[in-house]
Regions:
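Short, surface-exposed "cap/lid" segments of acyl-processing enzymes
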Residues: 70-118
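Serine-hydrolase catalytic core
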Residues: 232-311
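Gly/Ala-rich beta-loop-alpha elbow adjacent to hydrolase catalytic centers
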Residues: 159-167
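Conserved alpha/beta-hydrolase
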Residues: 115-133
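Active-site nucleophile loop of the alpha/beta-hydrolase fold
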Residues: 185-195
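N-terminal secretory signal peptides
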Residues: 1-38
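Catalytic active-site module of serine/aspartate enzymes centered on a nucleophile-bearing elbow/loop
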Residues: 313-356
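N-terminal export signals
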Residues: 29-36, 42-62
Length: 356
């Protein structure tokens, strides 16, 4: 009785007592545990990869949609001052070439600030770069088309920072087709990458490979960076907000355009093949304490590139870097003085003849 009670009863099999080979049972149970896990892991991995790819593509697509502008644009504001200047100075025009990262809309603001001084010599226009990147040939074609339509034979260039480099290359090309470039004004323009004080210039080559694939994320970072790097008298918070605002402005430049501008800057002046005659005046407009461009090095560089051309230097202290839209009165006076020196205005009255 005692021995019988101590013997345990055999366990009941889950399928009602069917006998199964012992060596197959563990294999069956392992199979049951693993089969559902493997597809689930693959499914989750596939979904994660798809989500990442979608987010990446959406990021780039959003950046493109935000900045869609496929052609270079020449814009001549239709206002009374420009019409009056066109009547006074037929066959002449100004072209403002914007700087690095300056949007089409901001280029218009810069022109508006400078137009009263520009109109003392010619009507004023500004250029909008294409978001596909800097292409001097296409930019030249856009300007050539505009000069043909308006019958322009004399051009004045205002180069806003980076725009001074582009103006230099374009001026030589325009001279080849018979259009004379009377004056080029360098508004805070570096003469080479060595003049640039921004330490990030060391990463231009890397940026050329990486930046075009950053989309909106890169746009946000670039906005903060540009705002803090060029506050123009604003506090850190206001400068960062302004930078982000410019970066996400629908008229803002694409990251691809900014990257090609940077690589163009790094290579300059190798793109310049000469062709600018010694009669073309070179205006040099700088804040001596510019924190983006070393003004002294830039001036020396331009004078070395154009040793036979007339130069005139005008300092605009405490204005920061390339900021006519922020300090319009200062820039108008400066531009007026430069033009009076390099391109004296035509006489409107007969000079007084001395008695003796």
């Amino acid at each position: 009785m005692t021995m019988a009670a101590s013997n345990p009863l055999p366990e009941q099999l889950p399928d009602g007592g069917a006998v199964h080979p012992a060596h197959k049972s563990p294999e069956r149970h392992r199979h049951i545990r693993q089969v559902p896990d493997t597809p689930r892991r693959w499914f989750l991995a596939t979904m994660a990869a798809a989500a990442a790819t979608t987010a990446f593509n959406a990021n780039i697509a959003a950046d493109y949609q935000l900045t869609e502008r496929s052609q270079f644009r020449v814009t001549t504001p239709d206002n009374d001052k420009n019409r009056t200047a066109a009547n006074r100075f037929p066959g002449k025009t100004w072209y403002l070439l914007p700087g690095f990262g300056v949007s089409y809309r901001d280029a218009g603001r810069k022109l508006k600030a400078l137009q009263p001084a520009m109109n003392q010599r010619a009507p004023a226009s500004y250029i909008g770069y294409a978001n596909g990147g800097i292409d001097i040939a296409q930019l030249f074609i856009a300007i050539q088309r505009d000069t043909f339509e308006r019958r322009i034979d004399t051009v004045y260039f205002y180069g806003d920072s980076f725009g001074g480099m582009a103006a230099t290359v374009l001026a030589g090309l325009l001279e080849e087709i018979g259009i004379h470039v009377r004056v080029i004004v360098m508004g805070s323009s570096p003469s080479s990458v060595r003049d640039v004080l921004d330490p990030s210039k060391e990463y231009i080559s890397l940026a050329g490979k990486v930046v075009p694939y950053l989309g909106l994320v890169g746009r946000l970072a670039a906005g903060v960076w540009s705002g803090l790097a060029n506050p123009n008298g604003q506090g850190m918070y206001e400068a960062a907000r302004a930078g982000i605002g410019r970066s996400f402005n629908q008229a803002s430049d694409s990251l691809i355009l900014k990257t090609t501008q940077a690589t163009f800057l790094q290579a300059f002046p190798t793109q310049y093949d000469g062709g600018i005659p010694s009669s073309t005046g070179i205006g040099l407009l700088y804040d001596p304490k510019d924190f983006i461009v070393n003004a002294r090095l830039a001036i020396v560089g331009w004078e070395a590139l154009f040793p036979k051309n007339p130069h005139f230097e005008y300092d605009i202290p405490d204005t920061g870097h390339a900021s006519p839209e922020i300090h319009p009165d200062v820039y108008r006076v400066a531009l007026t003085v430069i033009l009076d020196q390099l391109d004296p205005p035509p006489l409107t009255t007969r000079p007084v003849q001395p008695i003796f």
